Amino acid sequence: MKMIVGLGNPGSKYAKTKHNIGFMVIDQLCEKYNVTLNKHDFEAEYGSFKYEGETVLLVKPLTFMNDSGRSVGPLMSYYQVGIDELLVIQDDMDLTMGKLRLRQKGSAGGHNGIKSIIAHTKSQTFKRLKIGIQHPQKSTVVNWVLTPFDKDGAPVINQAIDQACEAIDDWCQNDDFMKTMNKFN
């Protein structure tokens, strides 16, 4: 079983903000695979589909970004998902707008949602799919991540979401994250 977690903040107020790029990817995967996030336990909404016989959980933690691990850890335990089968989709200010970067493991890199997942899983060895939102030029970090993409950024991000879904499909299909990294990084 694979578990794909998109990071974001719950509520319509945050729906189109940069920090919610993980939720946006999950939404597109739900559309592609006809999944409804109809389960509401573990402070998350989630659903599943079968990919060539393997169950894939799509998860949106509802704890707000900085407490995402409070949802992810218990879900992993309940469904007996190994740390090697967890993929977390996150925004990354150190990457240019729309750039994808896949990683096998790593530190939180200043991302509080990732920091929370590391704390609750007691591991840094889970997979990441990072999508660049670039660093703010003039605004503060909080204002930057909690504002929507502008008219120039929106098409770039829509393309990045498509690429992220392709990368996830690739990983589900070949079950070799290193191959997927080499293809999409």
From Swiss-Prot:
Site entry: Stabilizes the basic form of H active site to accept a proton: 91
GO cellular component labels: cytoplasm
Cell compartment(s), UniProt: Cytoplasm
Annotated site, Discriminates between blocked and unblocked aminoacyl-tRNA, chain positions: 9
Tagged with keyword Nucleotide-binding: no
GO-annotated biological processes: protein quality control for misfolded or incompletely synthesized proteins; rescue of stalled ribosome
Top class in the EC scheme: hydrolase
Reactions mediated catalytically: an N-acyl-L-alpha-aminoacyl-tRNA + H2O = an N-acyl-L-amino acid + a tRNA + H(+)
PROSITE patterns xref list: PEPT_TRNA_HYDROL_1, PEPT_TRNA_HYDROL_2
Positions annotated as active site in the UniProt record: 19
EC number of the protein: 3.1.1.29
Family: Belongs to the PTH family.
Alphabetized PANTHER family for the sequence: PEPTIDYL-TRNA HYDROLASE
Function: Hydrolyzes ribosome-free peptidyl-tRNAs (with 1 or more amino acids incorporated), which drop off the ribosome during protein synthesis, or as a result of ribosome stalling.
UniProt protein name: Peptidyl-tRNA hydrolase
Annotated source species: Latilactobacillus sakei subsp. sakei (strain 23K) (Lactobacillus sakei subsp. sakei)
Upper classification of the organism: Bacteria, Bacillati, Bacillota, Bacilli, Lactobacillales
